């Protein structure tokens, strides 16, 4: 069924982007590599205005978005893996420090370099939406973890010494939980939040994995030799994690309940540098910045595949379709995309684009989202004007009461 859908989408893409083909240029149909090989679909660099116009007029599939916070650049990815093109830059607010895409790329959280307002930008089709200012949220989080379905985000700031959980994203954000740093078992290295918006796990700087119940003390689940990433599987309370010292990926099932350990794969070697771990409907993917291959794990069959790459990736960013990931993007160089939904994961290139011919005017933080404290009926924000002025007069939500001390027998 997927191959039929792929052929239909490819036919539509070729019709919508026919103006982008260089005269006489022949484009091979996309194909996926045999085991141990990398097949790259080469395309002529298209005209960006034509790409955006074709996408709007022909309903070309949107693969996702690519961004560079350092350059203030955000671009559309049109097409499907193996047949895709970059669009012209989209408008983003000026002065961004970080841009955190939700897993399905229907919205992103925007952290400013200065100021005390966290932004939220939604994406409808091929266009960016309005920018919302989420008053009361941590403005410059060090760690952001989304639930697999993207309706919940956990934010942590070392400078502020607190953790927040925001549910109802993107349309109705609500602050449902605040955890002071003093209530955390150790320095936060990783966070993971499940699709229920409640189940929350912390990976510490000393390689321990804890579940953080809403009521009760943090509970130790596992201690790894070198914890290098963790994420919940979609629609479950099961946590996938990677221990680089042991070369193992493992599953902690039902972390809020009895919790049990399941070995997913061992012998996962060569993952030096910064490690990325993501989950999707297709399984789990583990990659690193100093390895020219990655590991794909099927969570049902427990089969692990080593997938060769054309170089060392710089990210593992989920795209619009669950199981598609952006591995590399830099202006002037081809982008790399992983499609892990097929039996044999495929790597494809997006043609390198020239430097943007134009940049849209930066957007202001101009729309206000009501971010409510679930423990109080009082909204914790004050409206601001379109100039992007800081939120003022925002009452600090009251943290949940601490649980009684544990009795030792």
Q: Can you annotate each of these PLM segments?
A:
Residues 1-9:
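Bacterial N-terminal signal peptides that target proteins for export
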Residues 10-19:
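Bacterial N-terminal signal peptides
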Residues 38-79, 87-103:
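Beta-strand-rich domains and repeat architectures in extracellular enzymes and scaffolds
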Residues 47-55, 94-104, 137-150, 183-193, ...:
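Repeated scaffold domains used in trafficking and secretory/extracellular systems
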Residues 61-68, 105-111, 151-156, 197-202, ...:
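Short beta-strand elements that form the blades of beta-propeller/WD-repeat-like
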Residues 71-75, 115-121, 160-166, 206-211, ...:
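Structural motif
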Residues 80-82, 122-126, 167-171, 212-216, ...:
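Short loop/turn segments that connect beta-strands within beta-propeller blades
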Residues 85-91, 129-136, 174-182, 216-222, ...:
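A short beta-strand motif characteristic of beta-propeller blades
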């Amino acid at each position: 069924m997927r191959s039929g859908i792929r052929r239909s989408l490819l036919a539509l893409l070729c019709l919508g982007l026919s103006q982008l083909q260089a005269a006489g240029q022949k484009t091979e149909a996309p194909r996926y590599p045999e085991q141990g090989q990398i097949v790259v679909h080469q395309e002529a660099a298209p005209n960006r205005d034509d790409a955006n116009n074709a996408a709007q007029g022909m309903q070309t599939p949107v693969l996702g978005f690519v961004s560079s916070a350092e350059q203030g650049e955000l671009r559309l990815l049109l097409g499907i893996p193996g047949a895709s093109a970059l669009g012209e830059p989209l408008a983003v607010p000026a002065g961004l420090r970080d841009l955190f895409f939700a897993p399905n790329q229907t919205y992103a959280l925007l952290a400013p370099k200065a100021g005390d307002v966290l932004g939220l930008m939604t994406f409808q089709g091929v266009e960016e939406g309005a920018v919302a200012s989420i008053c009361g949220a941590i403005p410059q989080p060090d760690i952001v973890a989304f639930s697999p379905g993207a309706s919940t985000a956990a934010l942590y700031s070392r400078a502020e010494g607190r953790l927040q959980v925001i549910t109802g994203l993107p349309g109705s954000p609500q602050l449902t939980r605040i955890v002071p740093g003093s209530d955390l078992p150790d320095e936060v290295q990783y966070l993971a939040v499940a699709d229920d918006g409640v189940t929350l796990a912390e990976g510490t700087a000393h390689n321990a994995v804890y579940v953080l119940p809403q009521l009760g003390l943090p509970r130790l689940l596992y201690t790894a030799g070198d914890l290098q990433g963790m994420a919940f599987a979609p629609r479950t309370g099961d946590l996938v994690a990677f221990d680089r010292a042991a070369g193992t990926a493992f599953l902690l099932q039902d972390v809020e309940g009895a919790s049990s350990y399941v070995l997913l794969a061992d012998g996962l070697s060569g993952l030096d540098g910064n490690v990325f771990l993501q989950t999707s409907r297709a399984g789990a993917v583990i990659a690193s910045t100093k390895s020219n291959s990655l590991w794909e794990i099927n969570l049902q069959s427990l089969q692990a595949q080593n997938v060769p790459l054309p170089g060392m990736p710089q990210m593992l960013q989920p795209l619009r379709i669950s199981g598609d990931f952006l591995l590399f993007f830099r202006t002037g160089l081809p982008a790399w995309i992983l499609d892990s939904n097929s039996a044999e994961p495929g790597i494809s290139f997006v043609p390198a684009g020239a430097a943007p011919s134009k940049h849209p005017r930066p957007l202001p933080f101009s729309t206000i989202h009501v971010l409510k404290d679930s423990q109080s009926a009082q909204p914790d924000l004050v409206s601001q004007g379109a100039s992007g002025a800081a939120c003022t007069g925002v009452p600090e939500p009251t943290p949940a009461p601490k649980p009684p001390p544990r009795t030792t027998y």
